[in-house]
Amino acid sequence: MVQDTGMTAEACDVCGDGSMVPHVEVALPRVGSVWINRCVRNACGFRQIRPRLTVPDLSAFYSADYFDDASQAGFQGYARQWHRYQRDAYFLARDLRAFRSRGRLLEVGSALGFLLGALAGNSDWTVEGVEISSFGAWYTRNRFGLTVHQSTLEAAHLQSNSFDFVIQKDLLEHVLEPRRHLEETFRIMRPGARMRLITPNGDADVGPMERARLGSPSEIPVLEQGHVSFFTRRHLLRLLNETGFTVLGLRNIGLRRGIRALGVVPFWQRRPAVILRDDLMRTVRNRNELMTDADVEKYRQRAERMDKEIERSSSWLRRWKPYYYYRYLVKCCDALPSSMTFGQDFDVLVQKV
């Protein structure tokens, strides 16, 4: 997939202007070379992959080996996230009880269901998920017995006004049309419902790739974890307000990671992974060899490896409740007020009034 060098005709998702121009060439394994475009309208500057990827592109990227440490792409060490999601669910369940004693909760982008499974065991809420990865949906159903719609949110056609709480953690940066996605989220939420949304700080996300483009012409920076949209605080708040949400709170989190990604300290900068152009094209040619929904036995084998990885990373300390509070305190110290943008991620709480 090769980006044209001129302006894109399709309008910017944030400001509505059509002047999106190529900014940084990046590599998306199994898809090819793509371009992060930038809106050149004054005071906008929104960055996004253009032309837009397709749903088949996303399905190829989020195949079963997206969660495999041996993969050239995807989320490395995902099994080790299991313990973090146990902690997150413990404190989220507490917040849910303070909000309402019970209700319906939807996680969009539920991955392998680590958070949903833990929430189901820590609260009286009814939980379900939406996940584009067929392996992710399969794993969640088989390991936790939960309802998961293997789809994008827009294609799931969920009932209007049906959820009391929505979680979108590390999700909005992956969707093809963020404004349309937020409108659909608003539609399925009941009046008074809330959403917890966490998405990367676009400047911190793009910064390492902007620096890497000055390297060898035979190498391309890899688009880590397949992010396709890059939001600043201003972009995010504008989209949320214009799609009907009331913002209740916003934090900038991940101070240390953000400083490294932004390159604030010259000798302490994060460097992105790079891939040779020939190796990138090899991943595209191998796209047809990915597992399909019919590969149930391969799914079982991959799931068993994931279970063993979780078990190997387990320890009594990580299951100890005082350790939960210690990690919670560390995260609080790694957060910034909403007016500051040095962190890696934005953490937003919104409500449908």
Model regions: which residues?
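Short, glycine-/aromatic-enriched active-site segment of Class I SAM-dependent methyltransferases
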Residues: 198-229, 234-239, 255-257
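Substrate-binding/catalytic lobe of Class I Rossmann-like enzymes that use SAM or dcSAM, i.e.
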Residues: 234-298
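Conserved N-terminal segment of class I S-adenosyl-L-methionine
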Residues: 1-161, 165-169, 179-182, 252, ...
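A short glycine-rich, Lys/Arg-flanked "PGG" loop and its adjoining helix->strand segment in the class I
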Residues: 179-194
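Short N-terminal helix/helix-N-cap motif within the alpha/beta-hydrolase-1
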Residues: 176-180, 207
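Short, flexible, mixed-charge acidic loops at enzyme active sites
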Residues: 59-66, 203-215, 264-267
